[in-house]
Regions:
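Phosphate/oxyanion-binding active-site loops and adjacent basic polyanion-contact surfaces
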Residues: 88-100, 130-135
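Short, glycine/serine-rich, charged loops/turns that create anion-binding
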Residues: 75, 81, 123-125, 159
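Conserved RecA-like ASCE P-loop NTPase motor core of nucleic-acid helicases/translocases
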Residues: 115-123
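Inter-lobe coupling linker of SF2 helicases/translocases
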Residues: 1-89, 93, 105
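A Trp-anchored, charged/polar loop motif used as the substrate-binding/catalytic surface
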Residues: 93-107, 161-165, 169-171
């Protein structure tokens, strides 16, 4: 059915790619950081290993614990240990704090040109229920450093095409300088 759908779509659509239009596109800069785990994260990883051994040995009911749950907990732990336990400390050299430092530095360096940066995070999106999430933590830390709150937006807060168009206009104008999304 897909080939037929594409054929019908092409009858009504005029498709132009950015290559065909020769549009100017700024060069993206990707920053990869290698960080050491906190002591709490090291303890959690050891616990994940023990859980995995129990699952492999069939000692745990799969509805209580399984490899998918362990993997998901590992992803959360790697991002921020507070995603597994909000009472754990905010590790000084965490991925979140490193991201905040980098984002603030880029924001400072781009003040004159009002440059924009995108931060992608597919875990811990804001739910609005008061639980810890990475998005609010990043925004709070950036505003504490002096970035105006209105210059930081979450794509999730713009849930219609009209709102998204307004957001992207603000991004292009340099009114929103940090956009977070998943």
């Amino acid at each position: 059915n897909l080939p037929e759908l594409i054929s019908i779509f092409k009858e009504a659509a005029d498709i132009q790619t950015s290559d065909m239009l020769n549009l100017p596109v700024p060069e993206a800069e990707f920053i990869n950081e290698v960080l050491k785990p906190s002591e709490e994260q090291q303890d959690m990883v050891a616990a994940f290993s023990e859980r995995a051994e129990s699952v492999r040995a069939g000692m745990v009911n799969p509805t209580e614990d399984n490899m998918l749950k362990i993997t998901n907990d590992g992803r959360k732990c790697a991002l921020d240990q507070r995603l597994l336990n909000e009472l754990l400390p905010d590790a000084e050299k965490s991925k979140i704090n490193t991201c905040v430092e980098n984002a603030f530095q880029v924001w400072e360096e781009g003040k004159a040109d009002r440059t924009t940066q995108l931060i992608f995070c597919d875990l811990s999106t804001p739910k609005g229920d008061g639980t810890f999430n990475v998005y609010d933590d990043v925004r709070n830390k950036l505003t504490e450093k002096g970035i105006p709150k209105e210059e930081i937006a979450f794509i999730h807060e713009y849930n219609t095409e009209t709102k998204k168009a307004d957001l992207f206009a603000k991004v292009r104008a340099g009114q929103v300088r940090i956009l977070m999304g998943s």
